[in-house]
From Swiss-Prot:
GO terms for biological process: amino acid transport; carnitine transmembrane transport; choline transport; glycine betaine transport. Residues 1-28 are annotated as: Disordered. Residues 9-23 have a biased composition (Low complexity). This is Glycine betaine/proline betaine transport system permease protein ProW.
């Protein structure tokens, strides 16, 4: 036993040091677990999961999300300059449409659009277009409507330039059509919001990425209906043209495309409607126009602002739908009259045409 009066007793010093180091005051008789020094991580290890036929999908079997993420990251790393180069023609054409539509005074643009509608679809449609465009301007949505129209027209132009030749090629190559058709199905059934993430990573945000995602979303209808229209041309007409010595080019431009034009224009109509709907959804990636008004109205709970944008979208959709339907009428429904003998153009040319 240590002497309590001896200050040099080492046993007493060691005992005091041990008590001082034990900050938690653990009693001497209590045994401590040497393996649980890290008390923050001392939770028991989870039990291993075993595959069960009753619940086979409890754990992810195919890590598709990580595969897609890694694939997109690889594409962005290696091909982003290529996609930035694709922006150039889209940006050029979009700026041209915007400068044209926004540069014209509103009364001039309204009269011009009304005359075009009269020429394409008759005087009734011309009057309806005039009243509708005046209504868009009266509710304070004119400039935003012109931006939306520029976006839609740009996307429609690229869809026609890409989709029409692709449809002709696939109509002539059934083997290629079997390969491309599942891709068109995927493009048409994929939710519109899914396109936004990779487009933002590859192109950024703004009007140009909005046009690109609109082109991707709205392209399948014109391709499908071009294939359908060409395949529906009667076989006896094709045989008759071949018997008269028509070349493949003459067969295409003088027989197949004219007879398939109503179906192709139905595809243009569907593409136009999808483009208009996608431009509104693309407002989430900073695309301007009427869709941005709707998005701001939703974000601020401003029912008035959202209603103005929605009414403008509805009016534009109705006008564009009726005009493309009128263009798609075949010659038999319009009669034997030439286009330049009707409408406002006919009023000007009538004195000079016998």
């Amino acid at each position: 036993m240590a002497d309590q009066t001896n200050p040099w007793d080492t046993a007493q010093v060691a005992d005091t040091t041990t008590q001082t180091a034990d900050a938690w005051g653990t009693p001497a008789g209590v045994a401590t677990d040497g393996g649980s020094t890290d008390w923050l991580n001392s939770a028991p290890a989870p039990a291993p999961e075993h595959f069960s036929l009753l619940d086979p999908f409890h754990k992810t079997l195919i890590p598709l999300d990580s595969w897609v993420t890694e694939g997109i990251d690889w594409v962005v790393t290696h091909f982003r300059p290529l996609f930035q180069g694709i922006r150039v023609p889209v940006d050029y054409i979009l700026n041209g449409f915007q400068q044209l539509l926004l540069g014209m005074p509103a009364p001039v643009a309204i009269i011009l659009f009304a005359l075009i509608a009269w020429q394409v679809s008759g005087v009734g449609m011309g009057i309806a277009t005039l009243i509708s465009l005046i209504a868009i301007g009266a509710i304070g949505a004119w400039s935003q409507a012109m931006i939306t129209l520029a976006l839609v027209l740009t996307a429609l132009l690229f869809c026609v330039v890409i989709g029409l030749p692709m449809g002709i090629w696939l109509a002539r190559s059934p083997r290629a059509a079997k390969i491309v058709r599942p891709l068109l199905d995927a493009m048409q059934t994929t939710p519109a919001f899914v396109y936004l993430v990779p487009i933002v990573m590859l192109f950024g945000i703004g009007n140009v990425p909005g046009v690109v995602v609109t082109i991707i979303f709205a392209l399948p209808p014109i391709v499908r209906l071009t294939i359908l229209g060409i395949n529906q041309v009667p076989a006896d007409l094709i045989e008759a043209s071949r018997s008269f010595g028509a070349s493949p080019r003459q067969m295409l431009f003088k027989v197949q495309l004219p007879l398939a034009m109503p179906t192709i224009m139905a595809g243009v109509n569907q593409t136009l409607m999808l483009a208009l709907s996608m431009v509104v959804i693309a407002s989430m990636i900073a695309v301007g126009g009427l869709g941005q008004m709707v998005l701001r109205g939703i974000g601020r709970l401003d029912m008035g602002l959202a209603t103005v944008g929605g009414v403008g979208i509805v009016i534009l959709a109705i006008i564009l739908d009726r005009l493309t339907q009128a263009v798609g009428r075949d010659s038999r429904s319009r009669g034997n009259r030439r286009w330049y003998t009707t409408g406002p153009v006919g009023l000007i040319t009538r004195p000079f045409v016998k």
